[in-house]
């Protein structure tokens, strides 16, 4: 694996596997258990995204997630900067409709990791200017979490990856079968919900995703080396 260094946060291992939580998709499986198993399987970023929870419950869950992820993976909180600060998370994932990246950077400081969901090359370039550390692009494929959304495909992944010097994280319908495709298109990682939450064995699911990404990542590096020879 390769390590990517930003100017503001610590070290982000690439290719990155981000597990986005959804306790409803997890069903009877305790979310804490699923998160821990996902980390054991290779998830190095956990994004807490439980938008229906009131602040007190989200904070309590965030504290538990921080305990599980400490010294094991990065922890991001979706949208809620107050919860990021309250539970000591590593940063925030900002949705397209969320606060401006520059405001989040001002609130959380220069050491926080900030991801930004972007729909276009122009938005990705603006996210970089405003202080984002990575951009999230999708849905790449059809996904049950956003059934009405039109998939953007791997072409947009490639275009954004070639336009900004930030890691591009692909989301939406990612599985072990297509994870390599998005990595070869230029993504620096993937973010998944149901591929792990809905799996009978979350650890095995994470391992399969990690393996698929790793193989495609090595292929990319070899192609780059040959091109530069």
Annotate each predicted stretch with a short phrase.
Residues 1-101, 106-134, 149-152, 159, ...:
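Conserved N-terminal beta1-alpha1 strand-loop-helix module at the mouth
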Residues 144-147:
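Juxtamembrane interface at the ends
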Residues 188:
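Short, glycine/charged-rich "phosphate-handling" switch motifs in NTP-dependent
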Residues 138:
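Flexible, gly/ser-rich surface segments that form the specificity/activation loops bordering the active-site cleft
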């Amino acid at each position: 694996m390769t390590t990517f260094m930003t100017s503001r946060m610590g070290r982000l291992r690439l290719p990155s596997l981000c597990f986005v939580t959804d306790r409803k998709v997890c069903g009877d499986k305790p979310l804490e258990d699923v998160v821990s198993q996902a980390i054991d399987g290779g998830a190095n970023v956990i994004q807490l995204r439980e938008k229906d929870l009131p602040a007190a419950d989200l904070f309590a869950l965030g504290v538990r997630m921080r305990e599980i992820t400490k010294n094991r993976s990065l922890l991001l909180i979706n949208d809620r900067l107050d919860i990021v600060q309250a539970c000591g998370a590593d940063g925030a994932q900002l949705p397209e409709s969320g606060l401006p990246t520059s405001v989040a950077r001002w609130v959380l400081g220069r050491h926080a990791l900030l991801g930004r969901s972007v729909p276009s090359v122009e938005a990705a370039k603006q996210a970089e200017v405003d202080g984002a550390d990575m951009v999230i692009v999708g849905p790449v494929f059809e996904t049950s979490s956003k059934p009405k959304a039109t998939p953007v495909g791997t072409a947009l992944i490639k275009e954004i990856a070639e336009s900004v010097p930030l890691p591009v994280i692909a989301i939406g319908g990612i599985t072990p079968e297509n994870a390599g495709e998005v990595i070869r298109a230029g993504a620096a990682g993937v973010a998944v919900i149901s591929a792990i939450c809905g799996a009978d064995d979350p650890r095995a699911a994470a391992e399969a995703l990690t393996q698929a990404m790793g193989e495609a990542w090595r292929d990319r590096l070899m192609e780059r080396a040959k091109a530069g020879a």
